[in-house]
Amino acid sequence: MIKVAINGICGRMGTRIAELVTEDKNLILVAAVENQKHQNIGKDLGQILKKELRGVVISHELREKPDVLIDFSSPDSTVERLKTCTENRIATVIGTTGLNMKQKECVKKATEKIACLFSPNMSIGVNQLF
């Protein structure tokens, strides 16, 4: 079973990915991460997904060690989580948009140490050209 964490859990993409992860028997959601000032910090993810409570509490910190972090957050949050992922050898999928050149350089540097997919536009057509 693959352990998954999602950064940006309360956004549209984060919520949708969480729904898909919870429906897949080969995946287990172990961490739900969001901006520290978000109103849902401390709530069980089940409240957000409107499903039975799952025991995954929304936090600002990545407390669990997942196999992969899926990130659809903000540029600053992405870079912060990427440092944690690099230090702990956690594979990362980044779909965050709006990264500046310095932040993109952090992503590039991380790829030297961990598996990292960076695609700020996840549409099939764009990724065939990317």
In which residue ranges do the predicted regions lie?
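Extreme N-terminal starter segment of soluble prokaryotic enzymes
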Residues: 1-5
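N-terminal Rossmann NAD(P)H-binding glycine-rich loop of SDR-like oxidoreductase domains
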Residues: 10, 14-18
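A glycine-biased structural micro-motif
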Residues: 14, 38-42, 55
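NAD(P)-binding Rossmann-fold cofactor-contacting core
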Residues: 23-49
